[in-house]
A protein has these predicted regions:
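A short helix->loop->beta-strand "cap" motif at the edges of active sites that frequently abuts
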Residues: 44, 91-96, 114-116
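Hydrophobic, well-ordered beta-alpha structural blocks that scaffold small-molecule cofactor pockets
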Residues: 1-52
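Mid-chain, well-packed structural core segment of small domains
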Residues: 62-102
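Mobile, glycine- and charge-enriched loop segments
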Residues: 45-46, 52-54, 58-77, 118
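Rossmann-fold NAD(P)-binding glycine/threonine-rich loop
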Residues: 100-127
């Protein structure tokens, strides 16, 4: 259960989570692939979510991802990001890591209302390279 008290978080707390979904256009934005690989290099289970993607390599939505996701890494425009936040609320996904350019005041407010912990930062900066 997500509670309103969980509405803020720091990146180091989220980076300890083991199961991630990276939401972005994996075919058009090379940073999305870099984020996925960086998380995997740290032993994370990472699901690729791309509304324009092609299964089975990518899931169309968070609802299609098997199992429980602990953290979503958001790498889409803020308008699409609002849809992702709504899916997170419906699925009970408690953590949102927002990459530069993907955030908005609306996303922050909606996360707070849903009790989703939100951190704005960059996985590539906050998670060192070359772990495994």
């Amino acid at each position: 259960m997500i509670t309103a008290s969980m509405a803020t978080s720091d990146g180091s707390t989220m980076l300890k989570k083991k199961v991630w979904a990276v939401v972005g256009n994996h075919g058009k934005n090379p940073v999305v692939g870099q984020l996925t690989e960086r998380l995997r290099s740290h032993g994370k289970e990472v699901f690729r979510v791309n509304p324009y993607g092609k299964p089975p390599a990518e899931y169309k939505s968070l609802e299609d991802v098997p199992g429980s996701v602990e953290c979503v890494d958001l790498v889409v425009n803020p308008r699409m990001g609002m849809d992702v936040v709504e899916q997170m609320g419906e699925l009970g996904i408690p953590n949102l890591f927002v990459q530069p350019g993907a955030g908005s005041e609306e996303i922050r407010n909606r996360c707070q209302a849903l009790g989703i912990a939100l951190h704005e930062g960059c996985v590539l900066v906050e998670l060192p390279a070359g772990r495994l």
